[in-house]
């Protein structure tokens, strides 16, 4: 039985026991991998590159939808919700790392196996596959819709018939020439430098959003005609709302959960970290989440204060409408699109690992299988990006169904199952709160989204 599960160092049924203070301190500094195994590996990825990789896993197209979320929750409501989700995301990573140290497993899927046997492993692997496919397709959807417009702004005259202004053609070329080769790399640490480039692109985007807040007047002066109606701003539209609730608010928590989900990449990054320990990886996580929170909040706040109620579900569309030929805006569009693009290969790693563990866990590594799984995933996400019309559908449904499981429900549930601590202990109470919060958020948000679709 032990051989069929892979490299377990303990039997199923082992539990996280109540720890003495000195044992807890030793756990914080203990490595996930044995010293012998770690010596056989490369020296590892530095702390900084690990932070960049994790931030790249966290940040993606979600940054474009948060200003829209802020407009539908209010400044104070958004701030509270975003901070709450960020803290809960960090705590759920803490639970995952604790369980991995104690059970001596190195993957999210194996935690599911350790807690609930083979069904647990299959559920976790299936959830990871669905979530990561949804995430990657949403990133490619951004590229398909925005890249042709970004290129067209640099051109004069009518070039509408040319291939480089066709979103589907560009999408296929990019996936074949960039995404697929990067996704084929054998180790996630190789993407550290591209992840650092993506981080600086995101910082540049946030800086431009701040600066351009004073370039677009409010009330908006543009007379924009669409479907026979004139759209304009009035003075009341230029007052920020501190609290706001509407049907569109149903997308708030799912979008935020989607924007902070990095849990499928935690253990792959941990296993390649230089001098890996629970405390060191938790510091990587806290740093990445804090920096992501800062960039998210700044870009969402100033994006909202630029357009107020007229903010688009994809923030870049607003700048295309009102600053269509601004050189800085045109440049930042290309930067943010490139940053989103560089996230896709990183998300390939946990998705491919989940497929491998679900169907080929007892087989040795094969480059042919590695190639074919990567190719299949690439084809699937391209097809989804072509046929899913609204990015909010991806954000809402994926966030409500799978992201909440991976970020809230599974860590809390697994810890409650494996731990033999007293239920009133702080860790177990925290795991219980995490579980209940995830169930409520997922079900409530999904119900509201379906209700909104029916009304439309």
UniProtKB/Swiss-Prot annotation:
Q: Where are the transmembrane segments?
A: 42-62, 85-105, 111-131, 170-190, 191-211, 250-270, 288-308, 327-347, 371-391, 394-414, 431-451
Query: Where are glycans found on this sequence?
Result: 233, 283
Q: Which UniProt keywords apply?
A: Acetylation, Amino-acid transport, Cell membrane, Disulfide bond, Glycoprotein, Membrane, Phosphoprotein, Synapse, Transmembrane, Transmembrane helix, Transport
Q: How does it sit in the membrane?
A: Multi-pass membrane protein
Q: Name one Pfam family in it.
A: Aa_trans
Which superkingdom heads the taxonomic lineage of this protein's source? Eukaryota
Q: InterPro entries this protein is in?
A: AA_transpt_TM
GO BP field: amino acid transmembrane transport; glutamine transport
Work out whether the entry's keyword set contains Glycoprotein: yes
Q: Which reaction does it catalyse?
A: L-glutamine(out) = L-glutamine(in); L-glutamate(out) = L-glutamate(in)
Q: Where in the cell is it found?
A: Cell membrane; Synapse
- Disulfide bond entries: 218-238
One example GO MF annotation: L-glutamate transmembrane transporter activity
| Positions of modified residues (Phosphoserine) | 4, 7
N-acetylmethionine is found on 1
Query: Does this UniProt record's set of keywords contain Glycoprotein?
Result: yes
Give the record's GO CC terms: plasma membrane; synapse
Which PANTHER family does the record cross-reference, listed alphabetically?
A: AMINO ACID TRANSPORTER, SODIUM-COUPLED NEUTRAL AMINO ACID TRANSPORTER 6-RELATED
Q: Which family does it belong to?
A: Belongs to the amino acid/polyamine transporter 2 family.
Q: What does this protein do?
A: Amino acid transporter with an apparent selectivity for L-glutamine and L-glutamate. May facilitate glutamine uptake in excitatory neurons. The transport mechanism remains to be elucidated.
Instruction: State the protein's name.
Output: Solute carrier family 38 member 6
Q: Which organism's genome codes for this protein?
A: Homo sapiens (Human)
């Amino acid at each position: 039985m032990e051989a069929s599960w892979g490299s377990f160092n303990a039997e199923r049924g082992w539990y996280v026991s109540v720890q003495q203070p000195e044992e807890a301190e030793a756990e914080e500094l203990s490595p996930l991998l044995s010293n012998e195994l770690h010596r056989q590996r490369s020296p590892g990825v530095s702390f900084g590159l690990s932070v960049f990789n994790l931030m790249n896993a966290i940040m993606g197209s979600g940054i474009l939808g948060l200003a829209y979320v802020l407009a539908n929750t209010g400044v104070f409501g958004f701030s509270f919700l975003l901070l709450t989700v960020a803290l809960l995301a960090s705590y759920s990573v803490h639970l995952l790392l604790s369980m991995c140290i104690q059970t001596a497993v190195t993957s999210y899927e194996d935690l599911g196996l350790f807690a609930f046997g083979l069904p647990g492993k299959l559920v976790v692997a299936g959830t990871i596959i669905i979530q990561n496919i949804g995430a990657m397709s949403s990133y490619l959807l951004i590229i398909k819709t925005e890249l042709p417009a970004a290129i067209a702004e640099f051109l004069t005259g009518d070039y509408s018939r040319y291939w480089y202004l066709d979103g589907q053609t560009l999408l296929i070329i990019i996936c074949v020439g960039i995404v697929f080769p990067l996704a084929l790399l054998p180790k996630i640490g190789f993407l550290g430098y591209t992840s650092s480039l993506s981080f600086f692109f995101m910082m540049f985007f946030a800086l431009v959003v701040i600066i351009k807040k004073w370039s677009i007047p409010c009330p908006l002066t543009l007379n924009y005609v669409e479907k026979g109606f004139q759209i304009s701003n009035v003075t009341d539209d230029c007052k920020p709302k501190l609290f706001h609730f509407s049907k569109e608010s149903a997308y708030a928590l799912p979008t935020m959960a989607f924007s902070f989900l990095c849990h499928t990449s935690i253990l792959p990054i941990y296993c390649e970290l230089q001098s890996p320990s629970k405390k060191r990886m938790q510091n990587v996580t806290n740093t990445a989440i804090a920096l992501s929170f800062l960039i998210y909040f700044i870009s969402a706040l100033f994006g909202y204060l630029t357009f107020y109620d007229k903010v688009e579900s994809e923030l870049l569309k607003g700048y295309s409408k009102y600053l269509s030929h601004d050189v800085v805006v045109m440049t930042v569009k290309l930067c943010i699109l490139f940053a989103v693009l560089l996230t896709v290969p990183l998300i390939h790693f946990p998705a491919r690992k989940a497929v491998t563990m679900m169907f080929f866990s007892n087989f040795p590594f094969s480059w042919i299988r590695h190639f074919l799984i990567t190719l299949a995933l690439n084809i699937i996400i391209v097809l989804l990006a072509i046929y899913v019309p609204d990015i909010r559908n991806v954000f809402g449904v994926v966030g409500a169904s799978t992201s909440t499981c991976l970020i809230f429900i599974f860590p809390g549930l697994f810890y409650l199952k494996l731990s033999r601590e007293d239920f009133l202990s702080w860790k177990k109470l925290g795991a219980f709160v995490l579980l209940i919060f995830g169930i409520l958020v997922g079900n409530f948000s999904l119900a509201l989204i379906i209700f909104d679709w029916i009304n439309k």
